[in-house]
């Protein structure tokens, strides 16, 4: 049995995709990112017009590698922001949470601004862990 998701009860809810853009290749996996966003939009009853999003993505132009963040609101408004992707000069030290996730939690299937679980767990990390 599928658990319903009540998107209207979460103020400012957005779907999120973050992707790489490179001067020589554009956004290599953008098809996969937009497919995932489209599926989530359909499931969560978000308006999704891929042609407008594609138009915006095709206008990206930079001599640098970019970290791009695409957000979509329930009424179909989207925002695309970019930032120069700086080389990572340090080793990452990671930590694992002791919390057990529930496969019944429908929010784990969607990349959204509903990130309470992630924020709570990240706040528990000791200094120096990524």
For every predicted segment, state its role.
Residues 1-67, 71-130:
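Helix-start/capping segments and mature chain N-termini
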């Amino acid at each position: 049995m599928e658990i319903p998701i009540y998107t209207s009860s979460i103020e400012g809810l957005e779907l999120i995709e973050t992707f790489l853009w490179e001067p020589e290749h554009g956004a290599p996996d953008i098809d996969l990112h937009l497919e995932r966003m489209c599926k989530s939009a359909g499931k969560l009853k978000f308006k999704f017009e891929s042609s407008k999003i594609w138009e915006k993505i095709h206008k990206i132009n930079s001599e640098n590698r970019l970290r791009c963040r695409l957000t979509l609101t329930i009424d179909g408004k989207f925002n695309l922001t970019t930032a120069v992707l700086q080389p990572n000069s340090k080793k990452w030290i990671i930590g694992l949470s002791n919390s057990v996730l529930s496969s019944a939690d429908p929010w784990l299937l969607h990349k959204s601004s509903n990130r309470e679980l992630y924020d709570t767990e990240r706040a528990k990390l000791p200094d120096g862990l990524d």
